[in-house]
């Protein structure tokens, strides 16, 4: 009967779980997303949806009880947080296209409100590493166009003037793609700030037409194994290093900010974007979740449901919406 229903009400979801039929949804059931109509909801969903192995998409209007949903969509224009004006079919389609990653992202974000930044970064890295062993990511690696890694002698420029430190991403020839060398250089720069309290402010920019186009695709699939990848990510974590000094950092963004290009800056005390800047989290389409800290940093600016929507759909967010949501503090 469930397979014939495009959406359920809150009582129907409760019946689904209490009746022991929770496995009727999820990747193995061919239903990685469940649309729940929130009209008349009483707030009883969290206990039920916490155990559902699927993305829970709440549909309603601002004012409805929203707890227990991973994503909240409405047809109301300019809805308040945590709603997104969108059609639920976009989330469902994204989950069906990449079910394991979509469900993993939803489950990861459910943990977020109970975790500090460091713990959330650990949880993200573990989830990312797990999905690296998954069939969709392996298929994506096998079918993608091979790219030659372009090494940069100085992937990050660091300059000091008085009490101010300037950090500049310096791979404009590849749209400042985030590679291992850039990560390591950023970690060193942020650790320098942590070690020197006389540095009172940090201005973080990117050279060229784009702040950062995300992870360098030429390096995808080069980690020896997922376990090593996790250990390296947490030993040389730009997110951890940035978190220690975030109160002194202002990020100046422009052009494309993809993946790491917004996941890391979102942690900065202040984020300023140029007109026309865009933002995107494409990782679920690869069979992964954000891996540079996005599930730990972005929700602290825009909330977990809107982060889930960004990550699941991979939609391009324009700068005006980014400001309205609080992902960006100002446009200059």
Which residues does each PLM region occupy?
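Crotonase-superfamily enoyl-CoA hydratase/isomerase domain that binds
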Residues: 50, 86-146, 293-325, 329
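Catalytic-core regions built around general acid/base machinery
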Residues: 45-49, 189, 234-245
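Conserved CoA-thioester-binding segment of acyl-CoA-metabolizing enzymes
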Residues: 1-49, 140-207
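N-terminal accessory interaction module
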Residues: 6-29, 34-94, 98
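Glycine- (often His-adjacent) and acidic-residue-rich active-site loop
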Residues: 65, 206-239
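Crotonase-fold acyl-CoA enzyme core
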Residues: 62-89, 93-95, 243-260, 264-332
């Amino acid at each position: 009967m469930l397979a014939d229903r495009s959406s359920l009400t809150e009582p129907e979801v409760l019946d689904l779980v209490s009746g022991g039929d929770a496995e009727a949804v999820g990747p193995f059931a061919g239903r990685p997303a469940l649309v729940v109509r929130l009209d008349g909801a009483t707030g009883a969903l969290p206990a039920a949806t916490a155990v559902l192995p699927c993305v829970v998409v709440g549909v309603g209007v601002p004012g409805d009880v929203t707890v227990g949903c991973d994503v909240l969509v409405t047809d109301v224009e300019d809805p308040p947080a945590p709603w997104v004006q969108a059609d639920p079919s976009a989330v469902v389609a994204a989950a069906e296209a990449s079910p394991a990653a979509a469900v993993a992202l939803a489950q990861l974000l459910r943990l977020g409100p109970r975790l500090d930044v460091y713990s959330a970064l650990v949880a993200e890295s573990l989830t990312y590493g797990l999905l690296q062993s998954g069939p969709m990511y392996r298929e994506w690696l096998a079918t993608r166009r091979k790219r030659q890694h372009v090494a940069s002698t100085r992937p990050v420029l660091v300059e000091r003037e008085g009490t101010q430190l300037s950090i500049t991403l310096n791979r404009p020839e590849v749209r400042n793609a985030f590679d291992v060398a850039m990560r390591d250089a950023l970690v060193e720069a942020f650790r320098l700030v942590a070690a020197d309290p006389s540095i009172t402010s940090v201005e973080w920019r990117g050279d060229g037409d784009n702040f950062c186009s995300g992870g360098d695709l030429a390096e995808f699939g080069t980690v020896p194994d997922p376990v090593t990848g996790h250990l390296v990510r947490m030993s040389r974590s730009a997110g951890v290093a940035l978190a220690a000094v975030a109160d002194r950092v202002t990020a100046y963004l422009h052009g494309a900010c993809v993946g790491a290009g917004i996941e890391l800056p979102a942690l900065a005390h202040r984020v300023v974007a140029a007109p026309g800047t865009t933002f995107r989290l494409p990782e679920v389409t690869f069979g992964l979740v954000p891996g540079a800290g996005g599930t730990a940093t972005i929700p602290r600016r825009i909330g977990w449901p809107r982060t889930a929507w960004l990550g699941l759909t991979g939609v391009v967010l324009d700068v005006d919406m980014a400001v309205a949501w609080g992902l960006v503090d100002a446009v200059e």
